[in-house]
Every structure is written in structure tokens, then in C-alpha cells.
């Protein structure tokens, strides 16, 4: 019988439920249990694929091509499991499914209501994940904050599941914030009110995770336990830590892992967290600082690139390097030039993105890395920018571009994929998900991966224009990764350069703590070597031609 853990949040949004869920999954997996995870998002969008990163942050792409909440990235990285489109459900999806069934006549003329039709659809999605994953434990995070009107159908559905699957097979965890006032005193009243709001919809929390930026003493735990009607053992302090990867160990040391196993009636097995403890020990070690520039469109909101950031850290931790990310707005590069803004960095990364705003700054950054021998990693749009920059150099003209930004460009080295030309809808229509890529022996990409074929996750409509393949290759561009039919260019690189590699896919989605992605590992290693060499010379060297 599958066990279910439902995680809600109170007091404020962004209280850390996603990291908490991911950490709980890690504790259960360390005890030998199989785990799957679901995020229930209360917004009416079908998925975040068409949402602004400023509204939602990163869109995380699953192997089966779903555009999902960034929390799924945390789940995958912490638990080291590949999730699917079943793991992210939105209110938009639920209502769309129910209305479609009503239009087909599935409800036989009945009046469609939130209860039971919407709640039944929510429960069906949870059950579908449990059946398909065959997991011992399914953890479900309910987005938003208890008290929000948008979350009510989800809360009602998980309340009903207590009866559907049996009380012994369900655990409710509530994550709250303990704010402090100017005297330094932590206040429990918001948590008490949040627990009461949860009770008002028929749910009594079994565990309270208390977020705070300072230690929580036993008196406060006992007070919360009294008002929430839970064991003191079930009031778990979660202080702010230096690294999110410390959270599973904090929860384990507070006894949460054993408590969950006990309450769910699972076999009591000791956790194997040695690899995780070794990871955290490496994070805490003193390391050489390595400045890396991330040149993007949404750099004001770091969550827009959260998987890229984590992938950089994974590779840096392995090599005992403290990566110092310099957040560079691409529009600033356009105004001020790359030499001024990229001075003193030893690696340049241009991540994925869409739209014309800031594109010339990204192209200039890619060209600056090429000219000055600074290690470069381009991801998706970052690969297209590198292609445009190189082609402008080879063809001797600035009139080289992607048709996404200039449909009338004389040299469209990046063009819309043929199977995208008749598509008018935006949502869920790109080239999405896992696709194979054949690597060319003797290239940096092949050496980094150490194999002939890989599978990577994609999210794009535009691709390298094969009309320019021959002329660019003859000028020194190395095409090191291709689709199996050899029609799609997946990786490009430059041979006489410390590291200039760019991929059409998103390698960041498959990086894991303790198992960094090969392209990020190679990039960080090359940047570290450039740092050592740079101590004997002044960086940067010269302005790029594209600035």
C-alpha cells in the first residue's frame, strides 16, 4: 500500500516547502524506500511554459517534455529521480480536464461542481502518479499558502484522501515561518493561526516544520506542540543554513526521518546518508573562489536560472571551488560593452531564453569569450548566440542573425525548425523533452561525456541552419553533437580554445549534487585553469568585434 505525505505551507509564501519536500524525499530514499513527488499548483495556467520568468521563475523540463514548476528541479536533484508530467498538476489542468469530460457527456448530464468533480479529478491525478511510479511513498506539495482561496479545492481533496486510503497511510506536514520582532523574540502566533486555518478545512497537521533565521529553543517547540496538538518530536526547527544541501541533514538530526517512518508504519531501517554528509563536508571546506559571469535577460530574479546555478555549484563542489556568479544583464552589455562588465571573470555562461531584448549583449559576450580565450558555456539560446557571433566573424558582416530576432536577416544561421512553421499556439508546442545526441569522437564534448551517445532535455523552436554548416565548419567551427539522423546540430565547439562549448539542449536539468553534468564539469575545470593562468596575466585582453 502506497503511503502519502501531504505538505502545506502557512504564514507566508516562499517559506521553503519545495526544499523541505525534496529533503524529506532524500531521507526516505536513504532508508531504501522508493519515492515519487508531486507539486499541486493553484494557478489557472495549464503550465508555466508561457509564464514570464519574473512571475514564476525557471520552467523546469522533465524527460517526457512537460514544462513544470521549478520545485520539480529540487525534487529531482535531491532525490536523484526522473519525474514526469504526472508530477506537476495545476488548477488549469484540472478544470480543463473536467470541462472536457463534461463536453463529452461523461457526467451524464450532472451538474458539475467543485465537490465532487474537481476534487475527484485532483485525487485521480494523485492516484495516477502512485500507480505509475509504484513508489512506496508519494509526497505531494500543495502550492500557495493555507487561507488562499485558490488552494481550497486541493486542500479539500487531500482531506478526503484520509478516508479514501486510510488514516494510517497518510501524513500531513505543515511548513510555517516563525518571524521575529526587534527584540529578537520569535513569535509563534502566526503559526498558531495558520494551524487553525488548516483545521478549518478539516486537516490536522501531524508534523510542523518551523522556518526561522535563528535557533528555536525547546520552550517554543513545546508551545507550538501544545497549540498544534502534535508531539514535541513532531515540531521540527528548520533554521536558515548556508547551503540548501544541508537541510536533509538538519531534518535527520532532528529525528524527522525516524518519526515519519514510525508514523507511516514503514519498516524501521537505518539511513545511509554518508554520501550526502560527504557532499556537505565538501561544501563547507575552504575553497578557491572562481568568478563566473552569467549573462542573461532575467538576472534580477535568480530563480529564473536556478537549475543553471545549481549545476554550476555541483561541478564546483566536486572540484573544491567556490563559484562566484557575477549576474550580468545582457542589456547592460549592449550599453557598456563586454570589456567593462566581464573584466575579472574566468568563465562566461549564456543560458537559455527567448525574445530580442538583450540579445546583442549575449552575442557580444559569446564573441568576447571567443576572442579572449575565456572558457564559454552556451545553453540553448547561448548556443545560438555563439553561432551568430562566430558566423559574423567568418562572413565579415553584422547582418547575421536568427530569424527569431530578425526575420529579414541576410544570413539566418539560426532558423525556425521546419516542423514548427505551421504551429500557432505557444503552450507546450516546442521541441520538448529528452532526445538522443550522437557525439563526434575526438571532440571536447565526446571527451567530457566519455561515450558516443547521450540523451538530453530540450526546449526550443529554433535550430542551427544547415545551409551554413559547411562554411562555418571550414572556418573552424566544430560540430561535436548531432541528432541520430544528423539533421539537427546539438553541440558546437571551437578547437583552439581553452573551452568553448555550447549545446542546443539544457544540460542543467540533469545535473545532480555529487554527480555534476559533464559539460558543467568541463566548463568549471577549464575556468579554474584559466584562473591559475590568469594570475600571471591581466584579464580581459581585447574588446570583441561584436560589441
Swiss-Prot record:
Instruction: Give the Glutamine amidotransferase type-1 domain ranges.
Output: 291-533
Entry annotation: catalytic residues: 380 (nucleophile), 506, 508
Q: What is its EC number?
A: 6.3.4.2
Q: Where does UTP bind?
A: 13, 187-192, 223
Catalytic reaction(s) noted: UTP + L-glutamine + ATP + H2O = CTP + L-glutamate + ADP + phosphate + 2 H(+); L-glutamine + H2O = L-glutamate + NH4(+); UTP + NH4(+) + ATP = CTP + ADP + phosphate + 2 H(+)
GO-annotated cellular components? cytosol
Give the record's keywords alphabetically: ATP-binding, Glutamine amidotransferase, Ligase, Magnesium, Metal-binding, Nucleotide-binding, Pyrimidine biosynthesis
Q: Name one GO biological process term.
A: pyrimidine nucleobase biosynthetic process
Q: Where is this region: Amidoligase domain?
A: 1-266
Q: How is its activity regulated?
A: Allosterically activated by GTP, when glutamine is the substrate; GTP has no effect on the reaction when ammonia is the substrate. The allosteric effector GTP functions by stabilizing the protein conformation that binds the tetrahedral intermediate(s) formed during glutamine hydrolysis. Inhibited by the product CTP, via allosteric rather than competitive inhibition.
Where do the annotations place Mg(2+) binding? 71, 141
Magnesium is among the record's keywords: yes
Query: Record-annotated residues binding L-glutamine?
Result: 54, 353, 381-384, 404, 461
Tell me its family.
Belongs to the CTP synthase family.
Q: What else is known?
A: CTPSs have evolved a hybrid strategy for distinguishing between UTP and CTP. The overlapping regions of the product feedback inhibitory and substrate sites recognize a common feature in both compounds, the triphosphate moiety. To differentiate isosteric substrate and product pyrimidine rings, an additional pocket far from the expected kinase/ligase catalytic site, specifically recognizes the cytosine and ribose portions of the product inhibitor.
Q: How does it assemble?
A: Homotetramer.
Protein name stated in the entry: CTP synthase
Q: What is the native source organism of this protein?
A: Chloroflexus aggregans (strain MD-66 / DSM 9485)
Name of the gene this protein is made from: pyrG
